[in-house]
Regions:
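Cofactor-binding beta-sheet edge motifs in enzyme active sites
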Residues: 2-26, 35-728
Length: 728
């Protein structure tokens, strides 16, 4: 057993007897359970459903675990309770999982982003279950008057082997609730896990496939009105005039008015960013009526002072110019200038990628019911914790009067990190004095969005006469953001290294997109490494392993972000599982490996050209994400990341003309189709006992690099510019 100190206080655990039917209720913060604070026994709040993270044990032995983090398809609503249940030592069949509301008084980091939920919650989740288990054992020891070390548990039952006594958790729950929270608990050895590491089906699975209400668009409250927003058609425009006479006269329309997204510049936080200030709101009884009235609006727009309309051609020109000039030096090892001057060979490559729209299957929406006393909000968001303050400020209500309930999200990919639509819904409800559901159309979502930036990267490598890599140079930038990760591989593996970056200002709103920065850098870096390996006459996997061995044996610098052993491990595993070097004669192979969000993924892509089109036959994946909590869900995430990565690199782009997005719906914004998905995807995990690391984002970036390298083998030409399909 591993002994862990609980250091439990109010923010970590709340223990009390459950009001209805006795039993034990243990509320906890996944993250705060390991922090130091004075221990205090507290009675359970009368409104127990307001507690965020909690564990409730009823008299019948049923265990209810509330999952506090937003569920976005990353399976935390299943995986987090699995961790608690394993340490509690309860039968998974006896566990009921519920989605918790926002409650910043009890919980910390209540968001979905950065592939952090399991990684940061791992220890706290385990301790929550282990603490409850010890309290149940203590209750049994006191009841039976036997030593605690003679008490064991198994699948929700407490045993005293010597006397033959046993009792279910439900029978002991009320007594356990009276016991002081222990200062130390015993965590299981990894070999003793019963639930962690086994495949459990998604707790929402049945509701999803049978169409039960789960998502924000499903939410309904009697008397609820529908709202939609008209915004400027292009970036760099603002509202000049409104003619809403026709719209107001249409059936079912309650009101038409204008709102300002922000009262002042101080409200423009990253989490509630919006592209436009002037928004024209239409409110009515039904979606159809509001949609028709919105179309009837006669709106006139004018340029924002000092803002010029932007075009994709302008973006390309500006990035090419910036990429050709020295940038800000972020890291420099050795003397790269001298190494390049004395090189036997110099390899260069320039890579670009366009703006991308998130295109969540469920467009942005949120419900708000604001009164003079309180505000109730319900809907899909990745950052409920961040938005609470913005909503409070806009409404003039104290934080304790803001209630945010989370629904399951129909996709996020970073788009729902930015909750301006939550603020908009709240402001609209306050204005019309009625409950309102704000709905974005697909066109609204794509033109009123927060986009993946357009990126650019220039690479240069030097080889000596023996084809050893002697210098490496990367200069990366983009529209308002740079994808540079200066301390990642191959930094640390080469004596002479230079990393620079630059950015270009723009009035187009950008933000996080699945695996921010990495979603471009992995493609560019891994494509270039293949080109360098070819110039050196080396196998691409062997070349990478050679560099990683240098990083292990004699690393350059002290700030390298990655673990070279784990990095090499996924390359070796994918080499084995793919049968590298033994591929079918009609298939062309590409490989890539990348580190992000504390995890390592390597891919091999098998491709053929059939009827002039690329057809992906196989994708082999080797993944090191530490302990795999739920293999079935982990495989699903990797498969999804592979398909998503291939689709965006091959087909997707968002272009601009006079500041206006040219792709506004799925008819002209290209996404991967079922027929274009890989025919086979294999997933293999590196087995170790490292605490879990990120998994929602790491599978996404590297497969794009493997795709580019497979395309080269299949077509004989390098693919430097996304989307690749335009050059095939």
């Amino acid at each position: 057993m591993n002994i862990a100190k609980t250091k439990i206080g109010r923010r970590a655990f709340i223990k009390s007897t459950v009001v209805a039917g006795g039993g034990m209720m243990l509320g906890f913060s996944w993250l705060a359970a390991c922090t130091s604070s004075p221990k205090e026994a507290l009675k359970m709040p009368k409104e127990w459903f307001e507690i965020n993270g909690y564990l409730k044990i009823g008299e019948n032995g049923v265990v209810t675990i509330v999952s506090p983090n937003p569920e976005i398809g990353q399976n935390v609503k299943t995986a987090m309770p699995m961790i608690v249940a394993d340490e509690l030592d309860v039968d998974w069949k006896m566990v009921v999982v519920e989605q918790g509301p926002l409650n910043t008084a009890i919980f910390t980091r209540q968001l979905a982003g950065g592939s952090q939920a399991i990684r940061q919650g791992w220890q706290g989740l385990r301790m929550a279950g282990a603490t409850a288990r010890k309290m149940l054992r203590q209750a049994a020891a006191q009841t039976w008057q036997v030593p605690l070390d003679e008490i064991t548990t198994d699948s929700g039952v407490v045993f005293h082997k010597k006397s033959g006594k046993q009792a279910g958790y439900g029978e002991l729950a009320s007594a356990a609730a009276q016991i002081p929270v222990p200062e130390e608990v015993e965590l299981k050895e990894i070999k003793d896990f019963k639930i962690i590491g086994t495949s459990k089906k998604n707790v929402d699975g049945l509701k999803i496939v049978t169409g039960k209400p789960l998502f924000g668009l499903d939410y309904y409250k009697p008397g609820m009105l529908i709202a939609m927003i008209a915004h400027p058609p292009a970036f760099g425009l603002k509202l000049k005039s409104v003619n809403d006479a026709t719209a107001k006269s249409m059936p079912g329309i309650k009101d038409v008015f204008t709102i300002q997204t922000y009262n002042n510049e101080n409200e423009k936080q990253w989490s509630d960013v919006s592209a436009f200030n002037d928004l024209v709101v239409v409110v009515g009884n039904s979606t159809w009526e509001v949609l028709n009235a919105k179309k009837a609006l006669k709106l006139e727009w004018e340029p924002v002072d000092g803002s010029a309309p932007e075009t994709s051609e302008m973006h390309t020109q500006l990035m090419n110019e910036s990429g050709a000039k020295p940038g800000r030096v972020r890291r420099k090892d050795g003397n790269p200038e001298s190494a390049f001057k004395n090189a036997a060979k110099v390899i260069e490559g320039t890579y670009t990628a366009p703006f991308l729209a998130h295109n969540t299957m469920e467009p942005m929406n949120f419900f708000a019911d604001v009164t003079a006393e309180k505000a109730e909000l319900v809907g899909p968001t990745q950052t409920p914790e961040f938005m609470e303050k913005s909503i409070s400020a806009r409404l003039g209500l104290p934080l304790e009067k803001i209630d945010i309930q989370m629904t399951r999200m129909g996709g996020g990919f970073g788009r729902r990190l930015y909750g301006h639509f939550m603020v908009e819904a709240a402001v609209i409800s306050q204005k019309v004095k009625a409950p309102v559901k704000l709905i974005y159309t697909r066109e609204d979502d794509m033109t009123f969005g927060i986009y993946r930036p357009a990126y650019h990267a220039y690479f240069r490598a030097a080889l000596d006469a023996q084809n050893n890599l002697t210098a490496f140079h990367v200069r990366a930038g983009g529209m308002r953001d740079s994808s540079l990760r200066a301390n990642r591989f191959p930094a640390g593996s080469v004596d002479n290294y230079l990393a620079e970056d630059w950015t270009i200002d723009s009035n187009i709103t950008i933000g996080a997109f699945r695996a921010p920065g990495s979603n471009f850098m992995a493609v560019a870096e891994q494509s270039f490494l293949d080109e360098v390996a070819e110039a050196a006459g080396k196998d691409p996997i062997a070349f990478r392993l050679e560099l990683l061995n240098r990083a292990k044996q004699n690393p350059v610098g002290e700030n390298n972000d990655y673990d070279a052993d784990r990095y090499a491990g996924v390359l070796e595993l994918v080499r084995e599982k793919s049968g590298w070097g033994k591929e079918a004669s009609n298939l062309h192979r590409g490989v890539a490996a990348y580190y992000c969000h504390n995890s390592y993924v390597a891919n091999v892509v098998d491709m053929a050209i059939e009827n002039g089109k690329p057809v992906i036959h196989n994708v082999y994946n080797a993944v090191d994400c530490g302990i795999v909590v739920n293999p079935d869900a982990a495989i699903n995430m990797i498969e999804g990341g592979v398909v998503d990565g291939i689709g965006h690199a091959m087909y997707s782009e968002l272009t601009f003309k006079n500041g206006e997005p040219q792709q506004k719906n799925f008819d002209n914004y290209r996404l991967i189709r079922h027929s274009e998905a890989p025919k086979s995807i294999e997933v293999h995990f590196v087995k170790n006992e490292i605490d879990p690391t990120g998994l929602g984002e790491p599978p996404f970036p590297p497969v794009m690099g493997a795709l580019a390298n497979a395309l080269y083998k299949a077509t004989g030409q390098r693919h430097y510019h996304q989307p690749f399909i335009k050059n095939i």
